[in-house]
């Protein structure tokens, strides 16, 4: 009996065991069975689990905000990029958050980092440790929606880390004269005391302003201040602090360690005697606040202050912090941490990593009074730290030379808000170690004497003007913890930033110079910003290849003016006609597309419009062109014009446009709706003969270049382009919108629906949804007509997509829908993005990157994961009992490494230097054409197969399902571990990779065995019917 071909064989049926099936009955499972199921598949901590994960010597990232590229792109796309964004107003350094998130969503990580470091020289540090819930995130408008605020800190960290991996140095503002030609004032000696965040920020901005003799004096043998010594490695790795310090040193800032404030080393008076024109005090608050009951207690007895404990932990866990490598403090048994601020929580979680069995956070007030940010509180809670509120320490009990307990009294708040201690309510808490984290002060009389003659306030802190950061001594400024206004790293950074401008203003005044009334601090610059992205096409010089298409963003000439002010290289006017062809639009006429599904807000992949050409007169546009060219001579203005198939009309209108001063013309032969009914637009652009003749008429009429705007709504766009060239056109625009009907409502009415009759017409679809059509059009024209100039349009929404069109053969790029999604300022992102893409092509060390995307290391939730299979020879997923096994293996590995006590390798930073020329725009035009051809030219010998990285796999089974129901049933799915395995029947179709939600979890690699297609039946078998 012949086999039944339309039934799966037994092997395939086995593979399909877990494939989804439509449900025909309600499910029935016992509660006990479901409890067991839940335990097996659980990924988050079990609420009934009371055992603590072994964290000793585990200093891996624990932040919830950390993002990998996938998470960053999804989160950035979710951002609304609001007008007058509240997130920016809530940031102490006033980061342009909207702009840097825009860059991330466009995969321009360099551009995002440039925006971040321009306003915050410690942008990576702050991305990691900022209490964003109380700052930028607290003002996010998406807080008013179901999905909640954007993870701004995680996005800031991600972009900054990618830039860090690029290893590109900071440079002086390119607009500054060389150092030798700078005015004398810029050689003034400036001293900064303390190498913490405030000083690093202040020095960075002063160096960006052009000052060349800046020295930071630091009493420790390491730099970074509290970022280095008190914020733990698992929240802020030392290589991050070092990276930002190296960026500062790129500008020539000097650091001298081992120099403290004292009569015998550094004083303000000695600095003045040595010729320093200005000084900045950023020494923080170096001494701990302690309760009298701890007087005389030592570390050997089990007592630490946060100022003792955290630096000890840092020195043993932060690679590169100092030359020494000391062991972790040996903390055993129960630990009491006193305090409710961020430092107390850092002490608590650090104690677990030093071996503490249990940690109790004890504080005087209630939970609602905890000063630590919610992010830190939640982390301590997850790590099973215990919280004991309303307790004030009264007595430390010592036996045998060791702390054994602490006695507390209860605190209560009365009706007036005053806190009282109730001596009748006593709590006796056993402990082996006590860590006091009650805050910091400036107490050392030697330091105060060295700061003489500045005045101190009643809190024993320097008197400082909160606007200028100037002390009572005009040449001395201060910022950070020492001032008493900054409570966070980012506020200290802003103090230094604020002070830098007023130090600049002060020094310039000393040399008889003035500064602008409005502060103008320079941006962050690197060699990327020096890349030339200008391009020539048809004899026209474009300052950059990005321009506005003839569409909604150029509705009026004042909009074009604003676009040029923002940085756009060129613009087309909205298409205009002779007065006899003037139009009046309908409404509604521009609507969101359905190609993104039910996604609302910006980031739409398509729009549909039934808008006609400009409602403004030719006279308006001609006068506007004249005005724009007068004020923006370096920008290209192209007049977009449209007539019916009438020689006199085309010659008249083109001559008017030329006379207005337009650099070039665009002949709109492709408007897909409305105008075609009038014998214009599409009615002219679908016939090669009509196109050829119109171009001949215009060529007879004008001397300036002109370009025919082509429609994609034809069978053969090359024949239209060839006709335009034969008619004398200097190039073509490819392409206009695609004709379509976007959608119908449930009652059958269309959207947009005009008037009471709810009528509509086929409109023009634009946006990234039509990019594949536009890319095909550009490449086919470029291949058929080599060297023929092409202005690309159709789904260009980033530097990356723009580069695709340049590689396809276009010379310049027109943008519309991306501006409709956002605003004119996206041009800044496009320019920095394109510069970065070109620059990175010259760095040999980054040749494995895909544009600005680095290779993806194995990770879960954006954090690197150890390859468990290499440690134990077995693959384990990240859930249920397998997750517990993983944690145990990792804990054992961390202890093994601790016992080895290997010295940390030194941190060395050698910025990558271009080893080959940075390509110009002309060098990349048409680069992709060599890879395009017919299907017959493709090799069916060189095949690929899928490989899945089990460490990155999140066990969703999407690869398995698509392979089953849309492919070749070549993936097995383990019923217990949900780990997919690719079988040798994989044909390399790549569907699995296409639906996998994790970037680079699936890769296609070369097939090592010959590919033999499954024919179903042997060849040459007679057909059944």
Curated annotation (Swiss-Prot):
It holds the Pfam family Fer4_21. Its EC number is 1.3.1.2. Binds 2 FAD. Binds 2 FMN. FAD binds at residues 129, 194-198, 218-226, 235, 261, 480-489. It catalyses: 5,6-dihydrouracil + NADP(+) = uracil + NADPH + H(+); 5,6-dihydrothymine + NADP(+) = thymine + NADPH + H(+). The active site is at residue 671. The keyword Nucleotide-binding applies. Involved in pyrimidine base degradation. Catalyzes the reduction of uracil and thymine. This is Dihydropyrimidine dehydrogenase [NADP(+)].
């Amino acid at each position: 009996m012949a086999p039944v071909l339309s039934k799966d064989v037994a092997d395939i049926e086995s593979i399909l065991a877990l494939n989804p099936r439509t449900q025909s009955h309600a499910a029935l499972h016992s509660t006990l069975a479901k409890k067991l199921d839940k335990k097996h598949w659980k990924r988050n901590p079990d609420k009934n689990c009371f055992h603590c994960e072994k964290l000793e010597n585990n200093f891996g990232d624990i932040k919830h905000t950390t993002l990998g590229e996938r998470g960053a792109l999804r989160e950035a796309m979710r951002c609304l990029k609001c007008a007058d964004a509240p997130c920016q107003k809530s940031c102490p350094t006033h980061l342009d958050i909207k702009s840097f998130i825009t860059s991330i969503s466009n995969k321009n990580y360099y551009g995002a980092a440039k925006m971040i470091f321009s306003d915050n020289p410690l942008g990576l540090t702050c991305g990691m440790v900022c209490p964003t819930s109380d700052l930028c995130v607290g003002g996010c408008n998406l807080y008013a929606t179901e999905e909640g605020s954007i993870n701004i800190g995680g996005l800031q960290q991600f972009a900054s880390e990618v830039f860090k991996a690029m290893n590109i140095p900071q440079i002086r503002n390119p607009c500054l004269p060389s150092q030798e030609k700078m005015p004398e004032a810029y050689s003034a000696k400036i001293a900064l005391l303390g190498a913490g965040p405030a000083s690093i920020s202040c020095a960075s901005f002063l160096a960006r302003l052009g000052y060349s003799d800046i020295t930071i004096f630091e009493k420790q043998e390491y730099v970074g201040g509290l970022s280095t010594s008190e914020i733990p490695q698992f929240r802020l790795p030392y290589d991050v602090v070092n990276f930002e310090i190296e960026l500062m040193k790129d500008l020539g800032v000097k650091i001298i360690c081992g120099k403290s404030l004292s009569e015998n080393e550094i004083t303000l008076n000695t600095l003045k005697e040595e010729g320093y024109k200005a000084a900045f005090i950023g020494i923080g608050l170096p001494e701990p606040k302690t309760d009298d009951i701890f007087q005389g207690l030592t570390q050997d007895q089990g007592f630490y202050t946060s100022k003792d404990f955290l630096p000890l932990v840092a020195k043993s866990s932060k690679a590169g912090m100092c030359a020494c490598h000391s062991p972790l403090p040996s903390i055993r048994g129960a630990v009491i941490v006193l305090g409710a601020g961020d430092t107390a929580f850092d002490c608590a979680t650090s104690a677990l990593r030093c071996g503490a069995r249990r940690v109790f956070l004890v504080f005087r007030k209630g939970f609602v009074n905890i000063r630590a940010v919610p992010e830190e509180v939640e982390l301590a809670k997850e790590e099973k730290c215990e919280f004991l509120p309303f307790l004030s320490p009264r007595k430390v009990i010592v036996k045998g030379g060791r702390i054994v307990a602490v006695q507390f009294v209860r605190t209560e708040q009365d009706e007036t808000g005053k806190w009282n201690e109730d001596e009748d309510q006593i709590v006796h808490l056993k402990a082996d170690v006590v860590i006091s984290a009650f805050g910091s002060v400036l107490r050392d009389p030697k330091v105060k004497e060295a700061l003489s003659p500045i005045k101190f306030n009643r809190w024993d802190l320097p008197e400082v003007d909160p606007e200028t950061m100037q002390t009572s001594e005009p040449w001395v400024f201060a910022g950070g913890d020492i001032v008493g206004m900054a409570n966070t790293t980012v506020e200290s950074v802003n103090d230094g930033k604020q002070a830098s401008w007023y130090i600049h203003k002060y020094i310039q005044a000393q040399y008889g110079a003035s500064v602008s009334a409005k502060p103008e601090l320079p941006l962050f610059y690197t060699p990327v910003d020096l890349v030339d992205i200008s391009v020539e096409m048809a004899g026209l010089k474009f300052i950059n290849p990005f321009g506005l298409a003839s569409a909604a963003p150029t509705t009026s000439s004042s909009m074009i003016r604003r676009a040029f002010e923002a940085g756009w290289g060129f613009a087309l006017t909205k298409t205009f006609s002779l007065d006899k062809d003037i139009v009046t639009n309908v409404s509604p006429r521009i609507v969101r597309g359905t190609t993104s599904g039910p996604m609302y807000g910006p980031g739409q992949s398509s729009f549909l419009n039934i808008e006609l050409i400009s409602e403004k007169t030719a006279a308006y546009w001609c006068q506007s062109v004249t005005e724009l060219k007068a004020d923006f001579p370096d920008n290209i203005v192209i007049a977009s014009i449209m007539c019916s198939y009438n020689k006199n009309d085309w010659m008249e209108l083109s001559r008017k446009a030329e006379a207005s001063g337009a650099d070039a013309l665009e002949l709109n032969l492709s408007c897909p709706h409305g105008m075609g009914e009038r014998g214009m637009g599409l009615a002219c652009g679908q016939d090669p003969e009509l196109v050829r003749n119109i171009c001949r008429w215009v060529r007879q009429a004008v001397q300036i270049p002109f370009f025919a705007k082509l429609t994609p709504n034809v069978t053969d766009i090359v024949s239209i382009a060839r006709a335009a060239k034969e008619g004398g056109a200097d190039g073509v625009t490819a392409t206009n919108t695609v004709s379509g009907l976007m959608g119908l409502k449930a009652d059958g009415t269309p959207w947009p629906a005009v008037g009471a009759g709810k009528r509509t017409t086929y409109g023009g679809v634009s946006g990234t949804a039509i990019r594949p059509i536009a890319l095909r059009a550009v490449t086919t024209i470029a291949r058929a007509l080599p060297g023929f100039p092409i202005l690309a349009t159709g789904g260009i929404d980033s530097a990356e997509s723009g580069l695709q069109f340049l590689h396809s053969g276009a010379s310049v790029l027109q943008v519309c829908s991306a501006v409709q999604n956002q605003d004119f300022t996206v041009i800044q992102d496009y320019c920095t993005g394109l510069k970065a893409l070109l620059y990175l092509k010259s760095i040999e060390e980054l040749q494995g990157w895909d544009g600005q995307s680095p290779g993806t290391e194995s990770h879960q939730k954006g954090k690197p994961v150890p390859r468990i299979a290499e440690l134990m020879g077995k693959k384990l997923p990240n859930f249920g009992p397998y997750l517990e096994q993983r944690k145990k293996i990792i804990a054992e590995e961390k202890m093994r490494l601790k016992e080895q006590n290997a010295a940390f390798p030194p941190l060395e930073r050698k910025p990558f230097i271009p080893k080959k020329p940075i390509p110009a725009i002309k060098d990349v035009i048409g680069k992709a054409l060599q890879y395009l051809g017919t299907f017959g030219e493709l090799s069916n010998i060189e095949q690929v197969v899928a490989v899945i990285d089990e460490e990155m796999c999140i066990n969703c089974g999407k690869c398995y399902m698509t392979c089953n129901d849309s492919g070749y049933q070549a993936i097995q799915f383990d019923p217990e571990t949900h780990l997919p395995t690719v079988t040798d029947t994989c044909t390399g179709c790549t569907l699995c990779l296409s639906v996998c939600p994790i970037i680079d979890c699936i890769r296609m690699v070369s097939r090592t065995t010959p590919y033999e297609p499954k024919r179903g039946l042997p060849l040459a078998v007679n057909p059944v019917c």
